Design a protein with these regions (language model features):
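Middle-to-C-terminal accessory/interaction subdomains
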Residues: 1-52, 56-188
């Protein structure tokens, strides 16, 4: 089975690498809406894992298209990579020429396709206008649920004593990051 999937995925990547990208039939092999949503998720939380993907998944059922996800491994998110601190810079691009990882080249290529960019822009604008506030409320609700555990944990470990401050920092960072992504997505046509 491994050889079957290896051959199948290699066929996709070979097609994806062909020029011109516009009109390229690679879109018959991967769900580009799932790609756009995947990119939005990683961009919103600035998960640099995408640049050197050792924890990136996609899946495919039968003769269907590849679909990005499930998502996981977010320990290098929220500006942690390179700084070892969360919630610092919110205005840093997800992709960087200094990264030079295989993920950088692979995922940036999707954003060279106007079909993906159009889905990205539409999906992002819908999220920002209609769902961001719900996400921030979820952060508050989840923090309330975690509070008893955080208090017990703080009896042993000092790193959770600033929990309330970190929740506020997370929400502020997400709002600022969303505004930053707006400035990127507005140019997508």
């Amino acid at each position: 089975q491994f050889e079957y999937w290896k051959k199948d995925f290699n066929a996709f990547t070979t097609q994806f690498a062909k020029e011109p990208l516009e009109g390229n039939s690679y879109v018959d092999m991967i769900d580009i809406e799932s790609v756009a949503k995947f990119l939005i998720t990683f961009n919103l939380v600035h998960n640099m894992e995408i640049n050197h993907p050792k924890s990136v998944f996609l899946h495919k059922e039968g003769n269907g298209k590849y679909v990005m996800g499930p998502i996981w491994d977010f320990d290098w998110a929220y500006d942690y990579e390179g700084t070892s601190n969360h919630f610092g810079r919110y205005n840093t691009p997800l992709f960087s020429s200094s990264m030079n990882g295989v993920g950088t080249a692979f995922f940036q290529r999707f954003l060279q396709d106007s079909r993906v960019k159009a889905i990205y822009k539409r999906t992002w604008q819908d999220f920002k206008n209609n769902k961001l506030d719900a996400l921030l409320q979820y952060v508050d609700d989840y923090a309330v649920m975690l509070k008893p555990s955080v208090e017990r944990n703080s009896e042993l470990w000092e790193n959770t004593r600033s929990f309330d401050t970190k929740v506020k920092e997370l929400k502020t960072w997400l709002r600022n990051r969303a505004d930053y992504i707006d400035s990127e997505a507005v140019s997508y046509t």
